[in-house]
Design a protein with these regions (language model features):
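A short acidic, Gly/Pro-enriched loop at the edge of an enzyme's catalytic core
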Residues: 176-187
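A short SAM/SAH-binding and catalytic strip from SAM-dependent methyltransferases
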Residues: 187-199
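A short glycine-rich, Lys/Arg-flanked "PGG" loop and its adjoining helix->strand segment in the class I
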Residues: 201-213
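Short, positively charged and aromatic/hydrophobic N-terminal segments
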Residues: 2, 19, 39-40, 56
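Class I SAM-dependent methyltransferase SAM/SAH-binding core
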Residues: 124-126, 130-177
Length: 237
């Protein structure tokens, strides 16, 4: 029923941008959940007593535990950023009101092809958070899709975008498992995301998959909170 209602409510924006409709995204998320459950059930059913008899985990048990751990991590990340959404949004609002708005646009655009047409240049902003990149790029006339795993962040992004929100396609997705077709975007941009990811390499593979041949991938990040587990950095901090 949810998928049918979503299908009725969805517009053609997704199709025009080679992006799954609301219902298709919900269906994809459902399939991913079912697949994970199937893996865990199959793994449990296939596990033998041989490993247990020797105090050794079977391969299927390892797969099951890894999948459970990943889902727990995603939930923890979503909870963390849900709590921080409003405060982080205020930081982005300050950036939008200052020189960073222009400085970041210049930084991004210097990497884009000179012969581009902004109106047809398709950009994916992964881990958009409160929407800083998606806002300044939409303001410059680009076709922007903004992705974040945390619903609260997407709500802040829409509020911060104001009138630009109608031009941005917002999607709630896991950055490591994107529901987009291969070679969809001319550029993929991200800021302050990869330090959150358990497996950045998997995320990079996905980002490259949805990037057109010859496209641009721009990732800006740092070792945030490195001082918490690195003695040398702790002294500097």
């Amino acid at each position: 029923a949810i998928m049918i209602a979503a299908k009725a409510a969805s517009n053609t924006a997704g199709a025009n941008h080679d992006i799954m409709s609301v219902s298709e995204r919900e269906q994809t998320k459902f399939v991913h959940r079912e697949r994970r459950m199937a893996i865990m059930i199959a793994a449990k059913a296939a596990s033998s007593t041989e490993g247990a008899n020797h105090g050794i985990m079977s391969v299927s048990d390892i797969v099951m535990r890894r999948d459970e751990k990943y889902m727990e991590l995603l939930e923890q990340i979503e909870d963390y950023w849900t709590d921080r959404a409003e405060g982080y949004s205020q930081v982005n609002q300050e950036e939008l009101a200052g020189d960073n708005r222009t400085n970041w646009r210049r930084e991004l655009e210097r990497h884009f092809p000179e012969n581009r047409t902004n109106e047809t240049y398709k950009i994916l902003d992964i881990g958009t958070g409160p929407g800083f990149f998606s806002i300044i790029l939409t303001e410059a006339g680009y076709q922007v899709t903004a992705v974040d795993y945390t619903e609260a962040m997407l709500e802040e992004a829409k509020k911060n975008a104001g009138a630009f929100a109608q031009k941005i396609t917002y999607c709630q997705m896991d950055a490591s498992h994107l529901a987009f077709a291969d070679e969809t975007f001319d550029a993929v941009v991200s800021r302050n995301l990869t330090w959150n990811l358990e497996d950045p390499e998997q995320a990079y593979k996905e980002w490259m998959r949805v990037l057109k041949k010859g496209g641009i991938l721009l990732n800006y990040d740092a070792n945030w909170y490195h001082h918490l587990f690195d003695a040398e950095k702790r002294e500097e901090y």
